């Protein structure tokens, strides 16, 4: 009874807030407006696929090195991923006509930029003096005016896992360090060293200390060379059917954001997956004609068959036990590719070709039906053509690809600004069950650019500045088996979200209904319909230095049985000038099982978007402190505890904790010099 009473108190704790008319305010529990913006766009599909984390890192990097609007190129504007296609076009046109602008406030003249978007722009752009020469700076200027940043992190668990006692070769602390040198948007040099809990440090295979290093050099605007990358980098072309090592567009983000453009970006991630290593360059060979060439060689982790062929390519990056270490860097991957793109009067046409070879043949286990058409062999190639027409009122984009499977994949999108307040979006895709690309990442329901056809329809309506309604419906058909469905299957996904803003209050309501087919008792029985309902109510309040957020999440899933889950959480924050900021949160969750799991955002560390998942019954507490003792030094500490009421052990296998609670402390320091 006490638990239920506490939940009611948490839900009603913000009931005394009074509303006023004004623009949207950044809510509690976020360090900035853009983090809350990303939170509102994220659903559990994006979180599990890693899209949210990828986008977070991109925006955090952009916040650290903002764009100078008076010297911004088309490529710079394309990096503002939170702008729609129409907003990008109108912003570019305005800057071309009115440079030099004197303040960001001038952008209010652009009709498509609402109050929220203008405030988002404030996070990532600034107005500097126009540079007529636009030449790459001298090395003397770079050495004198460049910025250094050193960032360190450690996570201390106040518990012991089974693997810590029996199998892991390293200590239980996770830590990483990152150094970066930057000269605005023109030059970035950096190195990251990362260590997962349980991995040996300066021991075993890690003679150089950390288990994983990421190093890069990225230069922009070197005359005709638009971008030059050395070391580790990520590449994206077209709509991602052939090459996309960056973030993918989810169903919610596709409704709001413009499709990311062709790009070469530095890889400063701690992840050991989805990056290239070598050299890449984008060159302007003629006005409005660019070409990109790249080459990569890197070691990869793999599970091998008895004949030394590759059974599975591993992307977890864990090297804690003898077994995991044996799979470390036991194969290599060589990749080369090229893209050419032509733009003229809003029309864009491009072509991409990618070739990949492995040191050992790929030979996956095809006894599972959903792996029947997985890539097999040693040498792989893919080619595609992408096309686009961009206009302030309408944008059309698409890509069609094939490869050595001789199968076809195509995706086509159209976005129409039907009126000043209404935008309509449609996305059609057809991915043959025989098509595959080792670097594809694009819009899909099943998470793969393979074995899927479907249609997505969405709308965003803003009847007035304080109200935004977003909705979509997506239908997908899988002609061959997929994970958890041994026969042809269908799914329908629907969402509606309403955001109401009356400063100092912001309210968000979200409801999602998803229907999909899955296996019944066994693979030979008929497929069973699985219905999933998810909802969220979020109330944010901000007044001067104080912020507060109340949130209620629910999940209701039916298949052969019902699974019900819900969570109510309350967070609050206080900021004292620029020196001290404190955020704290508490939540109670209760779910039947994993099917009704709940994800919720909480304040995390720098370069770490925190979106923990909960199932079972328990409570979550966290305290987040950030201080700046000097202008160039920032210290952050977070303590989080999860207490379960329905179990006396947490997790399983080597991750098992012989306790009903789990407490971690994270410490981070950032020094700019």
Over which residues does each language-model region extend?
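Alpha-helical interaction/regulatory segments in DNA maintenance proteins
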Residues: 45-60, 89, 97-100, 108-144, ...
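Exposed, low-structure sequence patches enriched in small/polar residues
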Residues: 168-172, 276, 329-364, 372-673
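Long, low-complexity intrinsically disordered regulatory regions enriched in P/S/T/G and acidic residues
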Residues: 20-63
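Transmembrane beta-strand segments of Gram-negative outer membrane beta-barrel proteins
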Residues: 138-165, 181, 185-191, 228, ...
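Amphipathic, charged-and-aliphatic alpha-helical interface segments
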Residues: 52-104, 121-126, 195, 199-201
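Outer membrane beta-barrel
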Residues: 208-301, 416, 421-437, 576-594
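Outer-membrane beta-barrel proteins
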Residues: 194-212, 265-272, 326-329, 401-403, ...
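Bacterial Sec-dependent N-terminal signal peptides
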Residues: 1-25, 673
């Amino acid at each position: 009874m006490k638990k239920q009473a506490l939940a009611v108190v948490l839900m009603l704790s913000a009931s005394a807030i009074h509303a006023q008319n004004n623009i949207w305010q950044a809510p509690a529990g976020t360090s900035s407006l853009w983090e809350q913006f990303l939170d509102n766009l994220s659903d559990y599909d994006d979180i599990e696929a890693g899209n949210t984390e990828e986008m977070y890192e991109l925006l955090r990097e952009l916040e650290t090195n903002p764009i100078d609007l008076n010297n911004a190129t088309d490529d710079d504007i394309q990096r503002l991923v939170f702008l729609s296609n129409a907003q990008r076009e109108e912003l570019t046109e305005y800057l071309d006509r009115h440079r030099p602008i004197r303040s960001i406030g001038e952008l209010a003249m652009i009709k498509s930029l609402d109050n929220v978007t203008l405030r988002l722009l404030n996070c990532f752009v600034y107005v500097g003096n126009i540079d007529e020469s636009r030449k790459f700076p001298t090395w003397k200027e770079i050495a004198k005016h460049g910025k250094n940043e050193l960032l360190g992190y450690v996570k201390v668990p106040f518990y012991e896992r089974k693997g810590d006692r029996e199998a892991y070769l390293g200590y239980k602390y996770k830590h990483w360090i990152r150094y970066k040198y930057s000269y605005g948007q023109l030059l970035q040099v950096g190195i990251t060293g990362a260590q997962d809990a349980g991995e040996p440090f300066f021991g075993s295979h890690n003679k150089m200390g950390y288990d994983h290093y990421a190093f890069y050099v990225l230069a922009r605007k070197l005359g005709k060379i638009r971008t030059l990358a050395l070391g580790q980098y990520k590449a994206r072309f077209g709509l991602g059917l052939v090459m996309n090592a960056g973030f993918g567009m989810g169903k919610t983000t596709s409704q709001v954001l413009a499709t990311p453009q062709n790009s070469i970006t530095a890889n400063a991630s701690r992840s050991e997956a989805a990056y290239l290593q070598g050299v890449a360059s984008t060159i302007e060979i003629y006005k409005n004609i660019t070409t990109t060439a790249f080459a990569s060689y890197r070691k990869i982790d793999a599970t091998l068959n008895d004949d030394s062929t590759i059974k599975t390519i591993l992307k977890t990056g864990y090297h804690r036990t003898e077994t995991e270490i044996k799979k470390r860097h036991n194969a290599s991957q060589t990749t080369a590719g090229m893209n050419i793109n032509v733009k003229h009067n809003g029309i864009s046409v491009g072509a991409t070709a990618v070739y990949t070879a492995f040191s050992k043949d790929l030979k996956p286990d095809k006894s599972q039906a959903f792996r029947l058409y997985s890539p097999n062999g040693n040498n792989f190639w893919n080619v595609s053509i992408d096309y686009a027409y961009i206009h302030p009122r309408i944008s059309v984009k698409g890509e069609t690809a094939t490869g050595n499977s001789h199968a076809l994949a195509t995706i086509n999108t159209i976005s129409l600004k039907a009126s000043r307040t209404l935008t309509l979006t449609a996305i059609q895709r057809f991915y043959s069950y025989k098509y595959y690309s080792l670097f594809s990442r694009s819009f899909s329901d099943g998470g793969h650019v393979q074995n899927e056809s479907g249609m997505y329809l969405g709308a965003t309506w803003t009847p007035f500045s304080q109200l935004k309604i977003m909705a979509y419906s997506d239908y997908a058909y899988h002609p061959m088996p997929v994970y958890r469905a041994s026969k042809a299957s269908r799914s329908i996904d629907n969402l509606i979200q309403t955001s109401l803003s009356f400063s100092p209050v912001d309210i968000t309501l979200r409801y999602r209904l998803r229907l999909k087919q899955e296996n019944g008792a066994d693979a030979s029985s008929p497929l069973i319909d699985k219905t999933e309902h998810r909802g969220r109510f979020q109330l944010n309040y901000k007044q001067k230095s104080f912020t507060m957020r109340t949130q209620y999440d629910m999940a209701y899933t039916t298949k052969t049985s019902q699974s019900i889950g819900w969570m109510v959480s309350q967070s609050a924050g206080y900021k004292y000038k620029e020196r001290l900021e404190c955020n704290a949160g508490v939540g109670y969750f209760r779910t039947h099982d994993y099917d009704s799991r709940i994800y919720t955002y909480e304040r995390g560390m720098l370069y770490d978007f925190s979106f923990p998942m909960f199932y079972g019954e328990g409570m979550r507490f966290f305290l987040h402190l950030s201080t700046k003792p000097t202008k160039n030094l920032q210290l952050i500490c977070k303590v989080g505890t999860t207490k379960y009421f329905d179990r006396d052990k947490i997790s399983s296998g080597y991750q098992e904790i012989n306790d009903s609670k789990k407490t971690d402390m994270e410490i981070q320091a950032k020094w700019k010099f």
